[in-house]
UniProtKB/Swiss-Prot annotation:
Family indicated by similarity: Belongs to the complex I 75 kDa subunit family.
Entry's localization field: Cell membrane
Location of the 4Fe-4S His(Cys)3-ligated-type domain: 99-138
Residue sites binding [4Fe-4S] cluster 3 per the record: C256, C259, C263, C291
Native source organism of the sequence: Thermus thermophilus (strain ATCC 27634 / DSM 579 / HB8)
Official protein name in the record: NADH-quinone oxidoreductase subunit 3
């Protein structure tokens, strides 16, 4: 450890620590604009200037001592940027003297010279770092210890301010105000270093310098993070622009349930309306980043909500009270035998809801219990790796597309190939200026092998990569096990896997939907003692499996017919609904299939409004907290399942969240997550074959509202030769019918799609399956 004296305090920090982080560790403050967690420190803004001294040394190399027996300090002639200066043993740092304060105040004034006075209308007002630094470090007498400085408290700039483009949309989600930009370069460094999409840069020189792109748009699935890290109001979220002031919004820390990563998010609401989603720092999971689908795809939560129960009368659904809905439940279920009832939970159902459904299924003795998006092979088949395990690994073998299936894994793999290690944790948390991060760090492409059914974005960082046909995962894994000869790339991956001392295996839906491939993947990991990250289509797959939400030997799965009476926390495929005597749906939005088949539809909260817990792909238990969003009479699945139990004549073991918490603690659920295991012989393999491959996507179909409509639009990918044979011109709008529903999609020609296959996106939890289907023109005729 290195001993550093900051003002009057001595701290010990690891070698390589920046002076800035040593100052924070000592409990003092230093202003900053350009430094940001997880980005390279560059010393661009010069706000973090401090005075640095080192012990004088004699000819013998030993420190010279003063009269008090203390090392004599030689101060550097100029102030230094603390973010790019490393600590040294015996260093003395001064952050409080007038010379330091004067320099910091001068940098504040310099930054404000051309900054517009937009604070009354700027969305960053109240959360602006420039506002805060101006108040804290600007030209104010009270911040100087030796009396007032002889400096004016007004600007000395006597010329016309610079005026540039103020309203420049970079994409449908992000707008740039170039007048407010202070050239800290956070956004440019972010794209270069974190997702690896170099789409922003400085253009022109000198006073004419501005941030821009070569073309309209930010071709990255992680562009929204620049709105969080921008220190001023230069980059803003268009979904929330001009809708509320920062101090008017209520902040709710919760967890995103769109994918199995479980990123920390903050839901900002006002007057019952969800206005904005921001990343919440969870160092072990998403650090300070989230994907664009998680950030911008929230407008559906406020639009066209189902707010009252609906009961079928005279062939159509009509609004009803909860009392009337309960009576309809009792009437519709009065002849139901327990084993005829199916309980099917949504993919983002909480642990508490899963436990109640499991207990209720036991009481009813029904085998029909499942959750939306459950894969043929359970995630709990594999020992879970943590995201920090990935950074400590020496090789990653990926079968799937993390960018679409678990987006934050894309960012973690970016860190992994740059050889970054988890940073040291200080008193103030993650370092603000981590000196191990450099601009334009080379990426070690030999550390990753990636196989996917199309050209995945991460292939640019994998020296070993290959595009394969859907369903060939089992053959690739057989070759990796050494039981079959594979392609040249598979042979290279096998060699790298065998040489690795601490590898991690990452599996996508294509493997998890195939029990043979999954068993081979388990064997591959077991032989090497490797841990696995399983990218399930369901957000809480590990948690619901732990609660026993799985079909019995004769039970029908979530997408199959079977149970005569059924509760659904989602909209299942139409085939699963046919022939049902009584259907209860618990939905946040009314769906055409619910209007056609449901006998009772009950209003449900979205995951933004839920209280409970999820388990992510690491096996980590994560909290959900309810944001105050207007949802009418919506009730959670705990209350609805309890009502269903009473209608069936069964006493529910609990109905309140606190009671569910006690039941979870009694079962020691969090501690048991890592020990849960399955063997595939206990589960029925599913064979699905067809020309349509349901491609996993970051954006989900339900997000296709508001500004997310274009990003979440479904696409039908086809090889150009296949497209010509099927008469599918580039850009055509077609309708596609599959067992999982009808989707309007845009035709996209791609050379990396195998001939004879059609890839369809935006069907969410059905990802990774091969199914039969047909393409129709919008009018209904066959294409």
């Amino acid at each position: 450890m290195v001993r550093v004296k900051v003002n009057d305090r001595i701290v010990e920090v690891p070698p390589g620590t920046s002076v800035m982080d040593a100052v924070f560790h000592a409990g003092y403050d230093v202003p900053l604009f350009c430094s940001e967690k997880h980005l390279s420190p560059i010393g661009a803004c010069r706000m973090c200037l401090v005075r640095i001294g080192l012990p004088k040394k004699g000819p013998d190399g030993k420190p010279l001592l003063n009269e008090k027996g203390e090392p004599e300090i030689q101060w550097q002639p100029k102030l230094a940027a603390s973010c790019v200066t490393a600590v040294a043993d015996g260093m003395v740092v001064d952050t409080l003297s007038d010379v330091v304060r004067e320099a910091q105040a001068g940098m504040v004034e310099f930054t404000l010279l051309n900054h517009p006075l937009d604070c009354p209308t700027c969305d960053k007002g109240g959360a602006c770092e420039l506002q805060d630094r101006t108040v804290e470090y600007g030209l104010y007498e009270k911040y100087y210890q030796k009396g007032p400085l002889e400096l004016p408290v007004y600007t000395r700039f006597e010329f016309t301010r610079r005026h540039v483009d103020k309203h420049h949309p970079l994409s449908p989600f992000v707008i740039l105000d170039r007048e407010r930009c202070i050239h800290c370069k956070r956004c440019v460094r972010y794209f270069e270093e974190v997702p690896g999409d170099e789409v922003l840069d400085f253009i022109e020189r000198g006073v004419h310098t501005f941030i821009g792109t070569m073309d309209f748009g930010l071709p990255s699935g992680f562009s929204g993070n620049i709105t969080d890290i921008c220190p001023v109001g230069a980059l803003l979220d268009l979904t929330a622009r001009f809708r509320a002031r920062n101090w008017e919004m209520e902040e709710t820390p919760t967890t995103c349930a769109l994918c199995p990563v479980g990123c920390g998010i903050t839901a900002d609401t006002r007057s019952g309306e969800l206005l904005r989603i921001r990343a919440r720092e969870v160092p072990e999971v998403n650090e300070i980043w989230i994907c664009d689908a998680g950030r911008f795809g929230h407008e559906w939560a406020d639009q066209n909500r189902l707010k009252t129960p609906l009961v079928r009368k005279e062939g159509r659904l009509v609004e009803a009270t909860w009392e009337e809905a309960f009576l309809a439940l009792k009437e519709g279920l009065k002849e139901a035998r327990g084993e005829e009832v199916g309980l099917y939970l949504a993919h983002d159902a909480t642990l508490e809801e899963g436990l109640l459904a499991s207990e209720l299924a036991k009481a009813l003795k029904t085998p029909h219990l499942d959750f939306q998006g459950r894969t043929a092979a359970p995630a709990s088949l594999f020992p879970p790796a943590s995201l920090e395990d990935l950074l400590q690994a020496d090789f990653a073998l990926v079968l799937g597309d993390p960018t679409e299936e678990a987006p934050i894994l894309h960012l973690r793999l970016s860190e992994f190939v740059r050889d970054l290690k988890p940073p040291h944790r200080y008193n103030h948390g993650t370092p603000f200026a981590d000196l191990q991060i450099k601009e334009r760090m080379p990426r070690r492409t030999d550390k990753m092998a990636l196989f996917a059914p199309y050209r995945a974005p991460l292939m640019k960082w994998a020296a070993i990569h290959e595009v394969h046909r859907p369903g060939e995962e089992r053959e690739i894994l057989l070759a990796l096990l050494g039981d079959k000869e594979g392609s040249e790339m598979v042979a290279k991956a096998k060699e790298a896997w065998e040489k690795a001392k601490n590898p991690v295996l990452i599996l996508g839906a294509g493997v998890l939907q195939d029990t043979v491939a999954a068993e081979r993947a388990r064997l591959l990991a077991e032989r090497k003692g490797a841990k696995v990250l399983a990218m399930t289509p369901a957000a809480n797959a590990r948690g619901l499996e732990a609660m026993g939400v799985l079909p019995g030997a004769k039970g029908a799965s979530w997408d199959e017919p079977g149970a005569l009476y059924a509760y659904y926390g989602f909209v299942p495929p139409e085939e699963a609904l046919k022939g049902k005597r009584f259907v209860v749906m618990h939905l946040s939005h009314l769906h055409p299939l619910a209007e056609r088949y449901a006998h009772v539809v009950l209003p449900a909260p979205t995951f933004y409004e839920k209280r409970g817990h999820l388990v992510n792909l690491e096996g980590r238990v994560l909290p959900l907290s309810p944001a105050p969003i207007e949802n009418g009479e919506a009730e959670g699945a705990l209350q609805v399942l309890a009502l269903l139990a009473e209608a069936l004549g069964v006493r529910p073991p609990f109905r309140l969240h606190l009671e569910a918490q006690k039941a979870l603690k009694a079962r020691k659920v969090p501690e048991a997550m890592g020990r849960l295991s399955f063997r595939l012989k206990e589960l029925r393999p599913k064979e699905r074959k067809g020309a349509f491959y349901l491609r996993p996507t970051m954006w989900k179909a339900h997000q296709a509202v508001g500004k997310a409509q274009e990003a979440a639009r479904a696409e039908l990918w086809a090889h150009p030769e296949t497209a010509r044979a099927e008469a599918l011109p580039e850009g055509a709008q077609v309708a596609v019918e599959t067992p999982f529903g009808r989707v309007e999609a845009r035709v996209v020609h791609r050379e990396d799609v195998p001939k004879g296959h059609l890839y369809l996106s935006a069907l969410g939890p059905a990802a990774g399956l091969r199914v039969e289907g047909r393409v129709l023109v919008p009018a209904g005729g066959e294409a």
